């Protein structure tokens, strides 16, 4: 069974996934903004590193840019979220079909997690890296005294490509693949395991569960994914920032961060990210299931 607890066509999984991703992107962007800004390694006028709390980030952003500042880079994330969720659910359902036991038609828990990892790797390459690089650069740029890029998704992306080439929107691909592959394995694997277990635990003959249960297990799977993949997320953000050239590689970024800021820096932004993924997990799986129901009809 796919995440919706039923077999759905590839076209339905893509549309349902893309719709869920777009809704989730809008609903959680302010929290994502706080997480991203808190992961930068900002410096004061003397070159000393500063640490900003989420409250300080909100206050500073509202003072300088108003409420719209909390949505800087939102369009890039919504477009990227729609694309990556469409790829994720399409790939996940296809990988699950490929990994099913040929004789029993069932899927083991390990195969569930492997399917999630495969889906995460594909979405990282085709959707997540470019969209998150653009989002990160636009947010980072908006905080600088002299912005380098034009505002807005289209003009901002054009500025990045013009100045840095296509490689400019594929920075940090290694940590993105590491983060997305492991996060999707944990998130989709955990959700599917709970999704399959819940109806059985209640003695239900149907795979249908109510929206509150869907939201709850989606949120729970998001929290588990956060703390299992947070270091990858911090490295990804730093490798995609405007001053990422100071890192020779992902390994250099890791060792430099540990040397100058300590291991705690690898979990910076974890509170903001866990807040986002609690909402994200609940929203994306709930919307996905509802869109599947609308497009494919009630379960027979």
UniProtKB/Swiss-Prot annotation:
Its main location: mitochondrion. Pfam families: Mito_carr. SUPFAM superfamilies: Mitochondrial carrier. The chain crosses the membrane at residues 11-31, 67-87, 114-134, 172-191, 208-228, 277-297. It is a multi-pass membrane protein. PROSITE patterns: SOLCAR. InterPro entries: Mit_carrier, Mitochondrial_sb/sol_carrier, Mt_carrier_dom_sf, TXTP-like. GO terms for cellular component: mitochondrial membrane. The keyword Lipoprotein does not apply. Keywords: Membrane, Mitochondrion, Repeat, Transmembrane, Transmembrane helix, Transport. Solcar repeats lie at residues 8-98, 107-197, 209-294. One of its GO terms (biological process) is transmembrane transport. It is found in: Mitochondrion membrane. Belongs to the mitochondrial carrier (TC 2.A.29) family. Mitochondrial tricarboxylate transporter; part of the gene cluster that mediates the biosynthesis of itaconic acid and 2-hydroxyparaconate. Cis-aconitate is secreted by the mitochondrial tricarboxylate transporter MTT1. In the cytosol cis-aconitate is converted into trans-aconitate via isomerization by the aconitate-delta-isomerase ADI1. Decarboxylation of trans-aconitate by the trans-aconitate decarboxylase TAD1 then leads then to the production of itaconic acid. This is Mitochondrial tricarboxylate transporter 1. It comes from Mycosarcoma maydis. The lineage of its organism: Eukaryota, Fungi, Dikarya, Basidiomycota, Ustilaginomycotina.
């Amino acid at each position: 069974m796919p995440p919706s607890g039923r077999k759905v066509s590839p076209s339905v999984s893509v549309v349902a996934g893309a719709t869920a991703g777009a809704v989730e992107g809008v609903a959680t962007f302010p929290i994502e903004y706080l997480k991203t800004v808190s992961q930068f390694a900002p410096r004061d006028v003397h070159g000393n590193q500063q640490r900003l709390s989420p409250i300080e980030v909100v206050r500073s952003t509202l003072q300088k840019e108003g409420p719209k500042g909390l949505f800087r880079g939102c369009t890039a994330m919504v477009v990227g979220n729609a694309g990556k969720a469409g790829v994720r659910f399409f790939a996940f359902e296809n990988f699950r079909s490929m990994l099913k036991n040929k004789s029993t038609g069932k899927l083991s828990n390990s195969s569930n997690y492997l399917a999630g990892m495969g889906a995460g790797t594909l979405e990282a390459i085709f959707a997540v890296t470019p969209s998150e690089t653009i989002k990160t650069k636009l947010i980072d740029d908006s905080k600088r005294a002299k912005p380098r890029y034009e505002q807005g998704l289209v003009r901002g992306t054009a500025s990045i490509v013009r100045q840095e080439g296509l490689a400019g929107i594929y920075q940090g691909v290694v940590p993105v693949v590491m983060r997305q592959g492991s996060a999707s394995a944990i998130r989709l694997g955990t959700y599917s395991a709970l999704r399959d277990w819940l109806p059985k635990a209640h003695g239900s003959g149907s795979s249908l569960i109510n929206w509150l249960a869907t939201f709850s297990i989606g949120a729970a799977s998001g929290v588990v994914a956060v703390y299992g993949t947070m270091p990858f997320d911090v490295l990804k953000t730093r490798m995609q920032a405007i001053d990422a050239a100071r890192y020779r590689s992902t390994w250099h970024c890791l060792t430099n961060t540990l040397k100058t800021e300590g291991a705690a820096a690898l979990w910076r932004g974890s509170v903001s990210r866990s807040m986002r993924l609690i909402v994200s997990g609940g929203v994306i799986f709930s919307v996905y299931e509802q869109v599947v129901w609308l497009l494919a009809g009630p379960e027979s």
